[in-house]
């Protein structure tokens, strides 16, 4: 009987991760098609997607308030949604890797953008922005950064990234109240 509850929890977790991946893929598609659509279409589509993420977050809140065993498992998904809604991370791929806690892929992405800036494929500003996102994600997931990476992050992190770090630090404490209050403040700020 106990395994049945665990099986249902695992199925729910898979469904939640699939929904998050769908929304993140949608965000990534919007960014990739930005040049091919009008600014109005871009803004409207992005707004709709962020609204869907807010609705998804509300559903997660309801689930977490009813089942405390899901709180820790859903915390990472909640944090990824907060990052997207608050727009602390601009790169959907980074949000996706962050939600999956995929250190290797984040490190690979960091190496790729370092190579791309040296080859002139991306601008220095894009390199800095994406590097900060990746390093902040790695740090938030408690992966060790080199002293050089720490210094780079401190030098370049934006106010929105600082806010995200401050708010998301509550998630690590694992309490339902902190998760819910953090989510509420992020949604309130994103709505402004």
Swiss-Prot record:
Gene3D superfamilies: Beta-catenin-interacting ICAT. Disulfide bonds: none annotated. InterPro entries: ICAT_dom, ICAT_sf, LZIC. This is Protein LZIC. Residues 6-65 form a coiled coil. GO terms for molecular function: beta-catenin binding. Keywords: Coiled coil. Belongs to the CTNNBIP1 family. The gene is lzic.
């Amino acid at each position: 009987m106990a395994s049945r509850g665990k099986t249902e929890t695992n199925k729910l977790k898979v469904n939640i991760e699939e929904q998050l991946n769908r929304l993140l893929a949608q965000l990534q598609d919007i960014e990739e098609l930005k040049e091919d659509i009008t600014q109005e279409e871009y803004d409207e589509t992005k707004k709709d997607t962020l609204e869907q993420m807010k609705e998804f977050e509300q559903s997660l809140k309801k689930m977490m308030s009813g089942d405390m065993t899901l709180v820790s498992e859903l915390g990472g998904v909640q944090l990824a949604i907060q990052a997207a809604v608050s727009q602390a991370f601009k790169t959907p791929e980074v949000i996706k890797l962050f939600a999956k806690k995929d250190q290797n892929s984040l490190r690979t992405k960091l190496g790729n953008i370092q190579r791309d800036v040296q080859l002139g494929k991306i601008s220095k500003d894009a390199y800095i922005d994406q590097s900060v996102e990746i390093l902040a994600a790695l740090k938030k997931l408690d992966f060790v950064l080199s002293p050089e990476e720490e210094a780079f992050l401190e030098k370049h992190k934006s106010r929105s990234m600082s806010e995200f770090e401050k708010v998301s630090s509550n998630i690590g404490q694992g309490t339902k109240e902190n998760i819910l209050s953090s989510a509420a403040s992020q949604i309130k700020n994103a709505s402004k």
